[in-house]
């Protein structure tokens, strides 16, 4: 009987107490990982890391009960997902190794080492490099805890032999990819006979997890600790040297001499127990439940289950968010192009163009989505209208200063304080002319906004159809240019009209009466114009210019909106309809190969996430009761 079953409260207790709760929770993550969901989500996991020769492989061997590749240099060359499933003693041991599209059924533990080596060569080549491709090893045995671990390559300090020169960076990048995730617990393996502060693995874990909330450290090789250093090891395991929230444990695995002596793993566990039980200093660690492989297995199972349970709500939210984003991306890409049937191709083309025109119509109706800033039109043009109004509002304010300057430079035979109609009209025309260029600038800005928005909408709807996108670009540009010219002509005509001084008598009189009693100080008329006749003229000029500005404040935006949005939209929709029947739909709908691949990937992701969503409720109850 192995040490996993030897003590009450260790394996048997684990099996009885957690059987109904542990396995469903761990199986959930294993199921999601098997579905390939790890491509889309960060799944809760325990990642095993350590420097080379830290004893990492020996720990995994002891936990799994099988011999894994070991030796000098980089032994783990690919991430190895080690799934340990505890079964009852009436069932036979079984193993299953999978990588890429390969599957190997293993009936004996002795075949594990060669099978893993073969998989590593297939993924990482015959040299000494590494690969990010994963190998999955599932072991069902009565001598293992319920546990899933991810074994990562040991950290190499310098490249040796056929290793790439940047092998240290490659390994650290791979390790960091896993341990930086909030969903990952780092199981850091460190030899007990060295200064733990100098180990790269613990430094890396501390960098991404400064408080140690996701880090559990395992000390190995306690039999190699120098005499007199035992108390330091005890203090380390008791979390008194470098503090970690999850703390430390210590184990003694098979050494090379044990392997040479053909000491099997079951015997090694019994030898480990005796070592700690009889050690003068380390026996206290065993009493505290901080030593031996069986207790480590129980601790890791508890940590993993608790970690998964804690992350279930986050996992649910991630799945829903990813599903929503995937749905949206597929909606943008649309359906795949039908086969060469001409009727179906025409119908598909009509559908794509109709969707584009509907999007333009939404812009015209000012039904804009706040999150899509690239396609918003009216809200941006409205800001231009506001700026235009500010320019107009500032005109009457400057009237007193402008009037004095104009009189000084243009006065002829008129008596002081008297201005004839020609002078009055000249001042009005001067102010109106000043406003023409800002109005045209408003039009140009509106054109740029519409051009950018329609271009973005076209890119969204015709992304992946380069020929169709090119075909619609021409009418987009042509129609916009025509409507811009029409609007420009109307604006120039409007300013020509404004140079003719005219206003209805009652409207003009009302403005004049409103101005006199209230706004002399506001417009600076009292202070700057001492001459009463000149001041009266200023009242008239200010009143008329206010009326003219009110006309322009509405008229220019109406012209811009009518041509840049309404007419342009109608003309462009007619041009889109003109593409139907006049062009080869097969040629227009020739799809970019990259888009077809993206659509295929998105559909596969959608199915993975749907499967994950269906699987998740099965464990929510167990997770909530943990």
Swiss-Prot record:
Chain ranges passing through the membrane: none
Sequence ranges assigned to domain Dynamin-type G in this UniProt record: 40-313
Residues covered by region (G1 motif): 50-57
Ranges for region G5 motif: 252-255
G3 motif as annotated region, ranges: 151-154
GO biological process terms held by the UniProt record: defense response to virus; receptor internalization; response to exogenous dsRNA; response to virus; synaptic vesicle budding from presynaptic endocytic zone membrane
Span of domain GED: 534-624
Recorded GO MF terms: GTP binding; GTPase activity; microtubule binding
Region (G2 motif) location: 75-77
Region (G4 motif): 220-223
Subcellular localization, as worded in the UniProt entry: Cytoplasm
Main location: cytoplasm
GO cellular component terms, A-Z: cytoplasm; microtubule; nucleus; plasma membrane; presynapse; synapse
Alphabetic keyword roster: Cytoplasm, GTP-binding, Nucleotide-binding
Family: Belongs to the TRAFAC class dynamin-like GTPase superfamily. Dynamin/Fzo/YdjA family.
Listed PANTHER family: DYNAMIN (PTHR11566), INTERFERON-INDUCED GTP-BINDING PROTEIN MXC-RELATED (PTHR11566:SF199)
Protein name, entry field: Interferon-induced GTP-binding protein MxC
Organism listed in the record: Danio rerio (Zebrafish)
Gene (name only): mxc
């Amino acid at each position: 009987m192995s040490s996993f079953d030897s003590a009450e409260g260790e394996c048997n207790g684990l099996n009885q107490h957690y059987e109904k709760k542990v396995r469903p929770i761990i199986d959930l993550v294993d199921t999601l990982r098997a579905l390939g969901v790890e491509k889309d989500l960060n799944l809760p996991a325990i990642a095993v890391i350590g420097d080379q020769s830290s004893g990492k492989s020996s720990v995994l061997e002891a936990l799994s009960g099988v011999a894994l590749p070991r030796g000098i240099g980089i032994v783990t060359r690919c991430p190895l997902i080690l799934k340990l499933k505890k079964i009852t003693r009436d069932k036979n041991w079984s193993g299953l190794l999978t990588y890429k599209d390969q599957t190997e059924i293993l009936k004996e533990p002795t075949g594990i080492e060669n099978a893993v080596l073969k998989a590593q060569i297939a993924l990482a080549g015959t040299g000494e490099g590494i690969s990010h491709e994963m190998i999955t090893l599932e072991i069902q045995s009565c001598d293992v805890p319920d546990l899933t671990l991810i074994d990562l390559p040991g950290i190499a300090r310098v490249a040796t032999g056929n290793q790439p020169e940047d092998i240290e960076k490659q390994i650290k990048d791979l390790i960091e990819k896993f341990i930086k995730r909030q969903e990952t617990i780092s199981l850091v393996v460190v030899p007990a006979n060295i200064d733990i502060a100098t180990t790269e693995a613990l430094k890396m874990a501390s960098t991404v997890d400064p408080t140690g909330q996701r880090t559990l450290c395992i000390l190995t090789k306690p039999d190699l600790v120098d005499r007199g250093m035992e108390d330091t090891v005890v203090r380390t395991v008791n979390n008194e040297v470098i503090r970690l929230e999850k703390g430390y444990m210590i184990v003694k695995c098979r050494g090379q001499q044990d392997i040479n002596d053909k000491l099997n793993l079951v015997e090694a566990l019994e030898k480990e127990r005796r070592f700690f039980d009889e050690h003068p200093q380390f026996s206290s660690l065993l009493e505290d439940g901080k030593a031996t492989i069986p207790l480590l297995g129980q601790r890791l199972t508890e940590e993993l289950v608790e970690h998964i349970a804690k992350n279930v709500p986050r996992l649910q939210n991630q799945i829903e968010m990813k599903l929503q984003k995937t749905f949206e991306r597929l909606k943008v890409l649309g359906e795949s192009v039908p086969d060469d049937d001409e009727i179906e191709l025409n119908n598909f083309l009509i559908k794509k163009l109709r969707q584009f025109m509907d999007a333009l119509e939404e812009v015209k109706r000012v039904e804009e989505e706040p999150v899509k800033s690239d396609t918003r039109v009216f809200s941006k043009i409205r800001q231009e209208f506001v700026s235009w109004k500010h320019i107009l509002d500032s005109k009457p304010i400057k009237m007193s200063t402008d009037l004095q300057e104009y009189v000084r430079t243009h006065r002829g035979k008129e008596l002081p304080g008297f201005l004839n109609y020609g002078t009055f009209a000249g001042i009005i025309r001067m102010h109106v002319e000043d406003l023409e260029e800002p109005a045209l600038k408003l039009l140009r800005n509106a054109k740029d906004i519409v051009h950018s928005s329609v271009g973005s909408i076209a890119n969204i709807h015709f992304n992946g159809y380069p020929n169709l996108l090119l075909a619609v670009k021409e009418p987009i540009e042509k129609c916009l240019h025509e409507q811009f010219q029409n609007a420009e002509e109307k604006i120039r005509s409007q300013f020509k009209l404004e140079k003719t001084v005219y206003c209805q008598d009652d409207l003009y009189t009302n403005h004049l009466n409103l101005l006199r009693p209230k706004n002399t100080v506001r417009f600076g008329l009292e202070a700057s114009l001492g001459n009463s006749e000149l001041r009266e003229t200023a009242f008239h000029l200010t009143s008329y210019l206010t009326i003219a500005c009110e006309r322009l404040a509405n008229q220019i935006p109406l012209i811009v909106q009518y041509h840049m949005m309404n007419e342009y939209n109608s003309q462009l929709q007619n041009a889109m309809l003109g593409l139907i029947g006049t062009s080869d739909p097969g040629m227009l709908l020739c799809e970019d190969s990259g888009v077809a691949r993206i659509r295929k990937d998105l559909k596969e992701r959608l199915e993975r996430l749907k499967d994950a969503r269906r699987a998740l409720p099965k464990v929510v109850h167990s997770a909530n009761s943990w």
